Amino acid sequence: HLRGFARTIPSFLMAYGTEDTTLANFDQIVPDEVFQEVTSITLEQFRFLRDGGDYEDTATGETKHFDGKLFDEVVFDDSIKEFLRLKRELANYFDPANEKDIFDYIPPQRTNQIFTPKATVAKMVSLLEEENPGCFDDPDKTFIDLYMKSGLYITEIVKRLYQSGSMKAAFPDPKERLEHIFEKQVYGLAPSEIIYRIATNYILGFSEEHNGKQYNFRMCDALPYAKDGTLSEKLDELFG
């Protein structure tokens, strides 16, 4: 259980972490239902492991005391700082020097948090361009990821649009070009709260100006709507 919990920490930091996050306040940044969904333990159980407390011995019925301190506070806090440093360092996905991305440091989970590698995503987007020549040169063309996990697919599309010669001609000002792309061209759905936060923090985390804006990204599991044939109506409801 502890090893499994340790693997979830980077996901929580990507979704909810701030520079002030420590072991002492870790339970305050994550909603209980999200924590339990990902780790299979409750925040109350986490606090018991961290802080200790009285408990009933199920074999004898006696009240006993557990001292807690199951986590090494120094190691835990240092690990948080290191992950957040990497997150900042790798945030600018427009920088060609960033060959890695933060998802190289987030272990896959047993839930649907398994991220497609960056190289595979780039191939997928190149294939999209082969099948739709000039799609990244058209300021009226729209793109949607119906099942976001990391946000990598959207960021690859954003990069191609942003770097397009035709888009540069239409929007010479880089800020205006980016704003147009985010407001008019890219859309995404994420199936759960933690995935929504991970994806949007990655997509918009390269810039303080954009981070925190909602744009056209929504928390919605598209699968049931796709199965019953009502996805088109749901998209109209979400995006108008």
Predicted regions located by residue number:
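SAM-dependent methyltransferase catalytic region
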Residues: H1-G240
